[in-house]
Amino acid sequence: MIQNIRLIAERGVRKASELYGLTFDNKLDSLLGTGMKENTLSYFYGKRVVGIINLLALNSVRHFGGKAFFVDAGNVADPYLIRRESDLRKKDSAATKKLLKSIALARVFTCHQLTNFVTDQLPAILLENSKSKDPIKFVGVSGMDQVFSEEDSPRSEIENLQRLIAMKLHDIAKDKSNRVMFVAVTSQNRCSHLLDYSDVAIEVYRSSGNRDRAALIRHDSLRGREIEL
């Protein structure tokens, strides 16, 4: 079951060492049959996806080294969750502190801040960081739809800004020169442009039987596959 701020790791899921790519350490690995593939844009949406970026940022640093960059538009960045998850596997507090320092956080509060950061500032940060011995290998954007409101912006402007963000995240994912391996984004409500530009899209929802389920909405070979979480 997916709770408010995290996905609960499930027993019986294959270990990360038996998979390839960036894993979730929960049943989403079973849905995909593997982890997130390199140089892909993965999109997760639904009311119950809160917490995914925290876990992916943690697992990226833990399994692939380097750094993770968390763009928090949904106010869901949870260092305590990350600390708890890392401590479950690493009792060494020094190692945990080092891991936490490897996850950079940028908070945005408006749709224009998010658009400007993703389209202008983030590419510049990634370009500079690509020269580092510990480059950013994961970029995650949480709660993208949370900073958009039709009360503040006309629908046409919202559509245009979301399209620009989706295009740029897709470009970042495909650009091997920036040394970013994985890009993921979440929203509570479905954003059509993110769906169009993503390589993998997963909807997490509550079924009529009051159970949490995940469905592959976009995938090159497994589209339509569903599991109970």
Please identify what each model-predicted range represents.
Residues 1-91, 95:
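The Walker A/P-loop phosphate-binding site
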Residues 117-122, 155-169:
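Well-ordered, non-membrane alpha-helical segments in soluble/globular domains
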Residues 69-150:
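Conserved inter-motif catalytic segment of the P-loop NTP-binding fold
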Residues 170-229:
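Phosphate-binding/switch region of NTP-binding enzymes
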Residues 56-60, 164-175:
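Catalytic-core regions built around general acid/base machinery
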Residues 39, 65, 100, 177, ...:
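Short, well-ordered alpha-helix to beta-strand connector turns
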Residues 42-44, 69-71, 104-106, 181-183, ...:
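Hydrophobic/aromatic beta-strand patches that form the interior of the parallel beta-sheet core
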Residues 39-43, 67, 136-140, 179-181:
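Residue-level preference for the first positions of well-ordered beta-strands
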